[in-house]
Amino acid sequence: EAAARAAMEMAGIGPETVGVCLVPTITADYITPSTACVLQNRLDLPEDTVCFDLNAACSGFVYGLHTAQALLAASPRKYGLVVCSEVLTRITNYTDRGTCILFGDGAAAAVVEYGETYPPMPTVLGARGTWDILNGPGINRGAEPVLYMEGTAVFRFAVETVPRCMDQVLDRAGLALEDVDEFVFHQANRRILEHIRKKC
């Protein structure tokens, strides 16, 4: 809520101008209602604001931006909120030292503005569901959910996939690598980012 209020204040917009409120999260407070609906009430957004959560893990913000852009094209209002929020301490396994050092709690929000004269935002999205890991098939691990990650596989996936996605999005935007002043990456791991930088 605080991140959303700060973003709206920085953008100089009031709640009545918001037509879309999206919350990318894997740690929502409730199964239902969605965190986005809770925010709609707390922020006093109009009742016809499109509100829902997105479960896309690390790629949630990118999915949120892409979805907000598409929804705003059909909205009577020109602003949307993308509010990323995670409370990963709820699901982190602190005995897994290779994983627990990567995660914490936090929230960030962005105001998205729709304009008919803006060029569409080139986006590359996708999924690779083959990498899910069932740790102990069919076993109920108890009341506390635990986040599990295969670090080496994640590293390989990131350093192979990110440069390819960069090439695709640059191609869709009609740009070359040299045309871009800054790239903003998901900050999961410094080694991954250094490897990508050298590769590009």
Walk through the language-model features, giving the residues of each:
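Short beta-strand segments
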Residues: P24, N55, Y79-E86, V112, ...
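Conserved catalytic cysteine-centered active-site region
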Residues: I26-Y79, K198-C200
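Acyl-CoA/ACP chain-elongation machinery
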Residues: C84, G129-I133, R190
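Condensing-enzyme catalytic core mediating Claisen C-C bond formation in acyl metabolism
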Residues: Y94-E160, R164-D167
